Amino acid sequence: MGRLFGSLFHQTEELVMTPLRQRMSEDMQVRNFSLNTQLSYLRQVSLFARHFGKAPDLLGREDIRTYQVYLANEKKLAPNSIHIAIAALRFFFSVTLERDWVPAEVLPLPKKPQKLPIILSPDEVQHFLGCVLDLKHHAILTTCYAAGLRISEAVQLKPTDIDSQRMVVRVEQGKGQKDRYVMLSPKLLEILRDYWRMPRPKEWLFPGDRAGHPITRDAVGQACAKAHDLSRLSKPVTPHSLRHAFAVHLLEAGADVRTIQLLLGHRSLATTAHYLRIATNKVCATSSPFELLPRPAPTPPPAKPEYF
């Protein structure tokens, strides 16, 4: 059963799922988890089962501990990646299996290092976007920056989400299953119109290679990597780093943190406040206390000795 649970993850949903996998999927659906979260959690439990070659309901606390050590020491996953795996296993054991022990005690979350993202300057963003040669890829990556969208949100846009009358973009079912509106830049609108005139997409603003499906995040990531190579920028560039740049550039231009929180779709203001640590204009505009110290009087050179 363990192999079957793991092997079905990549198969299409019309195929038969194991009862255990079906039950976990239903547990997430009734709690209104996003589709991305459901797929991520199912994949993490699948990887857990494959690691031991057993059905996950046959595994216990010691197996979980062994798996955590494996993820950290052998796979050398980043804390964020381990967080996702632990969140999935916590849900599986506490909700789907209804284990009587507390998963939070057995599955401690690793402490995340407070690393600051590397931020592109406005000139670097402009140079990078100029290196995205494909019209569709240029349009979607420009949207990630101009509207501050997550890549998962950008790929799900529909033509009807672009409201040129109110000059807003509707972001439907973003992270946390919350809709929101973000600004529609006149420059972005012009780029989107130029792009839309060519294929005239109907269902998805950025359709993928598969009929009836949007462009995949992997495809956008590959286009981003190709443009980064062409740009020869020393800083790393991903679709998410364009979103980071959007937030920091707004903050440096004088936008308040609360407005940026609404635009980014952050649930907590504390998440948005992290960008205060990155906005360099705030740092550069603050004088060092060293400047307040009085300048020492110049020391005269030593007098030459008199010999006669």
UniProtKB/Swiss-Prot annotation:
Residues 15-97 form the Core-binding (CB) domain. GO terms for biological process: DNA integration; DNA recombination; establishment of integrated proviral latency; symbiont entry into host cell; viral genome integration into host DNA. Residues 115-288 form the Tyr recombinase domain. GO terms for molecular function: DNA binding. Signal peptide: none annotated. It comes from the Bacteria. The active site is at R150, K175, H240, R243, H266, Y275. Keywords: DNA integration, DNA recombination, DNA-binding, Plasmid, Transposable element, Viral genome integration, Virus entry into host cell. Belongs to the 'phage' integrase family. May function as an integrase. This is Putative integrase/recombinase y4qK. It comes from Sinorhizobium fredii (strain NBRC 101917 / NGR234).
